[in-house]
């Protein structure tokens, strides 16, 4: 009887189609498979074709299944996920396809597919339509937030900022301070720290209001899952707990796993052997993430600043990181620079393993949320170079609140880069090493059996079962062994 109940549990996960969202969703998919669920991972057709190592993931998790649906754009058209038109296309085109997919699992018997009907949906927090469809079909739905609790709370505070007259701001000053958001954020948040295109809001626009409505609709879900932990963001988790039925802080989610997942970029593992040849804490790791683009001039300023610092560095040079037509010439110039064993350039790196390597002593980062959590978990101080989205406020918290990194902001010149690299790898970095080491210790405890992130994950699993009114389920006896504790 217990096995029959076990076989009925089928969770569908649907992330926003960007690496920074897909990665933590894949982590959650693996964790739910470890707990004994059938899991369907839903991606766009475009990104599904780009995923690497799917066969390895499928072999490790037989209960994990992949589906894909159209995002409304032709296969050969570039995807600009920051363009409101792309977001609108997904919401309009994908909604009926999503509904049909859920219905198809009801129509086709589990004997034919080997999988039961969908009994729970976990959707990206910035999507409203999966909640609409799940409610229509009477399927329990949860929202998963892949950015910080702080940034999530700002979505709910934007209407109050409009009411108070702080938005829109006609003077064009994106550094204008915002007040009344929360005591712990007073004097720290600026207009450019707001979600979406609100950072540049000199008038109210429909796409801005729609983006907020899409995300705040997540409060209708059965609960909010967050990739964070309470010691890091306790005040904002507390505020979100007054908005949502339930919250589950399960971060750093990658630290709950013993295995590594696939992604949209092919990792070059040769850099790990190179790191083996370097002294402890002697290497600066440089990566602008999966989405950020910089100009050729900015790239060369970073490059020469790193060279002038005299420190060893590992540079992730994504194939599409440079804006403009002179990308090939700039990249050629970099690769023709004599390394003399001091540096290495790769197209994409296994970031978690790199940060965890004893040779890495600093991280020059775009300050995406996944990168921050991975750096904290590894105990590596950061140089923060924010560009888009939540990265600006992340930078403020790294440098001013948590004091685990330096704030570069818009100073993309070689002198600033050289100065900050020297600082993070020398005297100032030593102080931050102690601070972030303590935070890393807390993060490690949170994902242990006695930690709140581990317990919140178990609570989520139990709540999914309860919402499906399945009782007598016997926990996977190997579940604890499959987690990194």
From Swiss-Prot:
InterPro entries given in the database record: UDP_glucos_trans, UDP_glycos_trans_CS
A Gene Ontology molecular function term of the record: quercetin 7-O-glucosyltransferase activity
Annotated tissue distribution: Highly expressed in young fruits 15 days after anthesis (15-DAA).
CDD domains: GT1_Gtf-like (cd03784)
Entry EC no(s): 2.4.1.350, 2.4.1.-
Entry annotated with the keyword Transferase: yes
Key words, A-Z: Transferase
Pfam family, one: UDPGT
Active site: 21 (proton acceptor), 124 (charge relay)
Residues engaged in binding UDP-alpha-D-glucose: 290, 351, 369-371, 374, 390-391
Family according to the record: Belongs to the UDP-glycosyltransferase family.
Protein's job: UDP-glycosyltransferase involved in the biosynthesis of cucurbitacin and mogroside tetracyclic triterpene natural products (e.g. siamenoside I and mogrosides IV, V and VI). Cucurbitacins have cytotoxic properties and exhibit deterrent taste as a defense barrier against herbivores. Mogrosides are nonsugar highly oxygenated compounds used as high-intensity zero-calorie sweeteners; they also possess pharmacological properties such as regulating immunity, lowering blood sugar and lipid levels, protecting the liver, and acting as antioxidants and antitumor agents.
Protein name (record): Mogroside I-E synthase
Organism encoding this protein: Siraitia grosvenorii (Monk's fruit)
């Amino acid at each position: 009887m217990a096995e029959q109940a076990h076989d009925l549990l089928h969770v569908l996960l649907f992330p926003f189609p960007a690496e920074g969202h897909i990665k933590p969703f894949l982590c959650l998919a693996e964790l739910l498979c470890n707990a004994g669920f059938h899991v369907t991972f839903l991606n766009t057709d475009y990104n599904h074709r780009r995923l690497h190592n799917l066969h390895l993931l499928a072999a490790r998790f037989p209960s994990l299944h992949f589906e894909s649906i159209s995002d409304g754009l032709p296969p050969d058209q570039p995807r600009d996920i920051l363009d409101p038109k792309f977001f609108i296309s997904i919401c309009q085109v994908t909604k009926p396809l999503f509904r049909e997919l859920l219905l198809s699992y009801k129509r086709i018997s589990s004997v034919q597919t080997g999988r039961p009907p969908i009994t729970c949906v976990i959707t990206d927090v910035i999507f409203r339509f999966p909640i609409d469809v799940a409610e229509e079909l009477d399927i329990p739905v949860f929202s998963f937030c892949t950015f910080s609790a702080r940034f999530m709370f700002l979505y709910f505070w934007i209407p109050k900022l409009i009411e108070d007259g702080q938005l829109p701001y006609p003077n064009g000053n994106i550094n204008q301070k915002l007040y009344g958001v929360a005591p712990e954020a007073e004097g720290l948040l600026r207009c450019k720290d707001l979600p979406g295109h609100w950072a540049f809001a000199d008038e109210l626009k429909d796409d801005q209001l729609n983006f907020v409505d899409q995300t705040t609709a997540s409060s209708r879900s059965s609960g909010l899952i967050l990739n964070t932990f309470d010691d890091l963001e306790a005040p904002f988790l507390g505020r979100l707990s007054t908005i949502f039925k339930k919250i589950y802080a399960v971060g750093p989610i990658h630290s709950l796993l013993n295995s590594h997942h696939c992604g949209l970029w092919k990792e070059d593992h040769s850099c790990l052997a190179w790191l083996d040849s370097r002294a402890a804490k002697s290497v600066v790791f440089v990566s602008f993430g999966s989405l950020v683009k910089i100009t050729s001039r900015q790239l060369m300023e970073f490059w020469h600043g790193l060279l002038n610092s005299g420190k060893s560095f590992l540079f992730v040079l994504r194939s599409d990181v440079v804006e403009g037509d002179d990308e090939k010439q700039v990249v050629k110039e970099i690769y023709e620079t004599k390394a003399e064993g001091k540096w290495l350039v790769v197209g994409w790196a296994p970031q978690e393993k790199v940060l965890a390597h004893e040779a890495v002593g600093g991280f020059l980062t775009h300050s995406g949320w996944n990168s921050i959590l991975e750096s904290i978990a590894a105990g590596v101080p950061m140089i923060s170079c924010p560009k888009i989205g939540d990265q600006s406020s992340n930078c403020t918290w790294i440098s001013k609140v948590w004091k685990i990194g330096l704030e570069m902001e818009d100073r993309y010149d070689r002198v600033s880069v050289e100065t900050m690299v020297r600082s993070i790898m020398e005297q100032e970095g030593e102080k931050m090493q102690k601070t972030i080491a303590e935070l890393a210790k807390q993060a490690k405890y949170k994902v242990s059996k006695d930690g709140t992130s581990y317990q919140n994950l178990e609570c989520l699993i139990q709540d999914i079962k309860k919402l499906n009114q399945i009782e007598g389920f016997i926990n996977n006896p190997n579940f604890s062994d499959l987690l990194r504790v």
